[in-house]
Design a protein with these regions (language model features):
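Short active-site neighborhood of thiol/selenol oxidoreductases, capturing the structured segment around
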Residues: 47-68
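N-terminal "domain-start" segment that seeds a small globular fold
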Residues: 20-47
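Short, internal strand/loop/helix patches
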Residues: 108-145, 151
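Loop/turn elements at helix/coil->beta-strand transitions in domains of secreted/extracellular proteins
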Residues: 51-55, 84-88, 116-120, 146
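Structural microenvironment flanking redox-active thiols in thiol-disulfide oxidoreductases
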Residues: 68-114, 125-130
Length: 165
């Protein structure tokens, strides 16, 4: 009986995740006050990071091959965001067995150091933000304008390995 209930719960949570949809364009920033820990131990919220012209939220992780393919552009993206007065934050939504799968805070610190990241890389405890955003893949970005309204959601660019100019 317990096994059946467990299987039903697992199936229903997977079913929900698979069919989750990203928030629609025009949506306000979800859960902007939730504090997340970044790799330096600092606690930040999306409101803390948002700048005059908006906010770029990047859902990412350490172990996804697609994330690795885009890594060389993360610092460029953070720099371009800052130059345009747009806040930039990368959020790791992986929560289940985080440490066992290479997604723990120490793993994130090592990963970030290996790529010389120069931006906030935070932990989304319990995947609360990922679920609120409807983020279902990594990397996946959400760009909000100065009013905190979503104007773009999707991939970083047209090709993870060789972007078109």
């Amino acid at each position: 009986m317990l096994r059946s209930i467990k299987n039903i719960l697992i199936f229903s949570s997977l079913f929900t995740f698979i069919f989750a949809e990203a928030i629609p364009l025009g949506s306000k920033i979800p859960l902007p006050e939730i504090k997340m820990e970044d790799i330096s131990g600092k606690k930040v919220s999306l409101n803390d990071v948002k700048m005059e012209n908006g906010l770029l939220v990047n859902f990412s992780c350490n172990t996804c091959p697609w994330v690795h393919a885009w890594q060389d552009r993360y610092n460029e993206l953070a720099k371009a965001s800052a130059e345009n007065n747009i806040g930039f934050i990368t959020i790791n939504p992986n929560s289940r067995n985080r440490e066992k799968i290479g997604e723990g805070l120490k793993d994130m610190q090592k990963f970030s150091n290996n790529y010389d990241h120069d931006f906030l890389y935070t932990v989304d405890e319990g995947s609360k933000l990922a679920m609120a955003f409807g983020a279902t893949q990594t990397p996946q970005v959400f760009l909000f304008d100065s009013n905190g309204k979503l104007v773009y959601q999707g991939v970083i660019d047209d090709n993870p390995r060789k972007p078109k100019k």
